[in-house]
């Protein structure tokens, strides 16, 4: 006779999904001792930290002022190390030099480091002994509003008027604010300015148990990491999260990891302190994969990534979510905290010039740039470009039209309605970009390129109507663009993604709004440039630089 076995019951053992990280190496600067006080509520209750909402507004405003203009010293050191690596390509070093120059310019707080000053993202952890009268989110949002009004930033947030119609808010609000409960008498924060380029390179991949073995996982990551391409402005800080109790948890940890928030995480699973851990060995392997992809720091080489963070999490037995993402060369985040001693913000590097190498561009570039005069008929410009192979470095001078997503969509509507493509799209090169605000006394605000790939669906249509014959932007493009350029005799020129302040200060001489002013920063602009740097990426013969890597 069979006996029924009693089920084995595991003892209750609470283990946090992600163990607490200390950030003990982070250095902070004191903003103020105002707005905080310790109060005794009585009735046997513990003392409380009272935080005036003005403290949240000050911290938020100062944090975004800093991250838009300054970088962490660790990021700058990673750029500087490229010059000491004999395996780094000349292209790697050239891009790194531009990014360091850009950091030096933006540290003056007149031009932000990137024209896409991003979505304001705030994560806050409020201790149970912290009391804030009023609305925390409102106070933090006020700080975002204040600094975006004050500084030469860009308003990038669109709100829906209907399912299909939308408008720019003109404030960069709403911000994304996630607030959590924690223990203690401290309110801690992470502030992130996340641009569209790197945000769009966050991928959730729903896999299965079959990928959880060394060979399969390595092959999987080798294939998927190339999906980033160069449009999010490498060198990257790459993050990989394997597992997760839900899709949203995987992606949240991914974003935090790309910001180095979990650098202090345990490196082995611990049944008492935490299951989620960093795999340092796999991080080194994945970094080598990135170095061998060939894209390098945008135009070929080793430095596709500065570093890699790989985090393993618990998962449901039927699911294996994997998240991969990046923080780009505009690596913009800072920690903050409010405690009984005052309001504190992470120290970012205010003297980036110390990381500049004693090196001139001419020492890196073996051949001089081809000078291209854009102020002549388009057929002549195309004839000049056709003389040179992909990879050729150019120096552009003349008139360029600036148009991006919304302007392209409106022009397509014009064509669909039987109207002609605007003449300026036929007579001049088109630069995919959207400027930050123009500082007083300067011809341009920060004005770097946006991701070219988003405009790929428009290229064949526009070129068939004689427009977009020369395109200028950042990143690699799809085969449909290569085919269109081959068919119609067009070109795609790549610009370095990241050094938006350098371009504004050195290459852009005049900016004026030409058309579609109601689109805000996505309006059509006319700019005059002088020695604007670019590379031939796709030519009129069916060649694509990135396909040759």
UniProtKB/Swiss-Prot annotation:
Substrates-to-products reaction catalysed: (S)-malate = fumarate + H2O
Q: How is the cofactor bound?
A: Binds 1 [4Fe-4S] cluster per subunit.
Look up keyword NAD and say if it applies.
no
Give residues annotated as binding (S)-malate 1. 115-116, 154, 197, 404, 450-454, 474
Q: Name one GO cellular component term.
A: mitochondrion
Identify the keywords attached in UniProt to this record, alphabetized: 4Fe-4S, Iron, Iron-sulfur, Lyase, Metal-binding, Mitochondrion, Transit peptide, Tricarboxylic acid cycle
**How does pH influence this protein's activity?**
Optimum pH is 8.7.
Name its pathway. Carbohydrate metabolism; tricarboxylic acid cycle; (S)-malate from fumarate: step 1/1
User: Has keyword Transit peptide?
Assistant: yes
Kindly give the InterPro entries that the UniProt entry links to this protein.
Class-I_Fumarase/Tartrate_DH, Fe-S_hydro-lyase_TtdA-typ_cat, Fe-S_hydro-lyase_TtdB-typ_cat, Fe-S_hydroAse_TtdB_cat_sf, Fe_dep_fumarate_hydratase, Fumarate_lyase_CS
Q: Which residues bind [4Fe-4S] cluster?
A: 114, 233, 328
Activity regulation summary: Specifically and competitively inhibited by 2-thiomalate, which coordinates with the catalytic [4Fe-4S] cluster.
The alphabetized list of GO BP terms reads:
fumarate metabolic process; malate metabolic process; tricarboxylic acid cycle
Under which EC number(s) is this enzyme classified?
Answer: 4.2.1.2
This protein's assembly is summarised as: Homodimer.
Q: What does this protein do?
A: Catalyzes the reversible hydration of fumarate to (S)-malate. Catalyzes the hydration of fumarate to L-malate in the tricarboxylic acid (TCA) cycle to facilitate a transition step in the production of energy in the form of NADH.
Family the entry assigns:
Belongs to the class-I fumarase family.
Name the record gives this protein: Fumarate hydratase 1, mitochondrial
| Native organism | Leishmania major
């Amino acid at each position: 006779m069979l006996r029924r076995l009693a089920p084995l019951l595991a003892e209750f053992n609470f283990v946090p999904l992600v163990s607490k990280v200390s950030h003990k190496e982070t250095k902070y600067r004191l903003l103020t001792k105002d707005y905080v006080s310790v109060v005794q509520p009585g009735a046997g209750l513990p003392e409380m930290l009272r935080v005036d909402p003005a403290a949240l507004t000050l911290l938020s405003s100062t944090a975004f002022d800093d991250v838009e203009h300054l970088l962490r010293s660790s990021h700058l050191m990673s750029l500087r190390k490229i010059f000491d690596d004999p395996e780094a390509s000349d292209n790697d070093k050239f891009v790194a030099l531009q990014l360091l120059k850009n950091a030096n310019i933006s540290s003056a707080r007149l031009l932000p480091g990137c024209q896409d000053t991003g979505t304001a993202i705030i994560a806050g952890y409020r201790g149970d002994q912290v009391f804030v009268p009023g609305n925390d989110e409102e106070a933090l949002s006020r700080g975002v509003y204040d600094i975006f009004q004050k500084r030469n930033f860009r308003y990038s947030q669109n709100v829906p008027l209907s399912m299909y119609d939308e408008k720019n808010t003109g404030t960069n609000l709403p911000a994304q604010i996630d607030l959590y409960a924690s223990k203690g008498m401290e309110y801690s924060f992470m502030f992130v300015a996340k641009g569209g380029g790197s945000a769009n390179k966050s991928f959730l991949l729903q896999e299965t148990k079959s990928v959880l073995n060394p060979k399969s996982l390595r092959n999987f990551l080798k294939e998927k990491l190339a999906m980033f391409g160069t449009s999010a402005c490498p060198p990257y800080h790459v993050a990989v999260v394997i597992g997760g109790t839900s899709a949203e948890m995987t992606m949240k940890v991914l974003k935090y990891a790309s910001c180095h928030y979990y650098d202090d995480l345990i490196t082995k699973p611990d049944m008492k302190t935490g299951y989620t851990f960093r795999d340092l060995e796999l991080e080194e392997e994945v970094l080598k994969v990135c170095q061998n992809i060939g894209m390098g720091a945008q135009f070929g080489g080793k430095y596709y990534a500065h570093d890699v963070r790989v985090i393993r999490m618990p998962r449901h037995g039927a699911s294996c979510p994997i998240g991969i993402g990046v923080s780009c060369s505009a690596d913009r985040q800072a920690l903050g905290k409010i405690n009984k001693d005052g309001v504190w913000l992470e120290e970012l590097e205010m003297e980036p010039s110390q990381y500049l190498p004693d090196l001139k561009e001419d020492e890196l570039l073996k051949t001089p740039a081809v000078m291209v005069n854009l102020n002549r008929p388009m057929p002549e410009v195309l004839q000049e470009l056709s003389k040179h192979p992909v990879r050729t470095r150019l120096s552009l001078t003349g008139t360029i039209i600036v148009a991006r997503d919304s302007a392209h969509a409106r022009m397509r509507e014009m064509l669909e309605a039987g109207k002609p493509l605007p003449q300026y799209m036929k007579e001049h090169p088109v630069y995919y970009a959207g400027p930050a605000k123009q500082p007083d006394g300067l011809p341009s605000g920060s004005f770097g390129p946006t991701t070219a790939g988003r405009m790929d669906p428009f290229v064949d249509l526009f070129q068939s109507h004689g427009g977009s014959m020369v395109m200028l932007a950042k990143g690699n493009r799809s085969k449909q663009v290569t085919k269109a350029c081959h068919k119609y005799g067009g070109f795609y020129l790549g610009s370095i993604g990241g050094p938006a302040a350098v371009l504004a200060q050195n290459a852009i001489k005049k900016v004026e709004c030409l058309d579609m002013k109601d689109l805000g920063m996505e309006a059509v602009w006319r700019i005059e440039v002088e020695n604007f740097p670019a590379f031939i990426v796709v030519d009129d013969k069916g060649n694509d630089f990135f396909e040759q890597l």
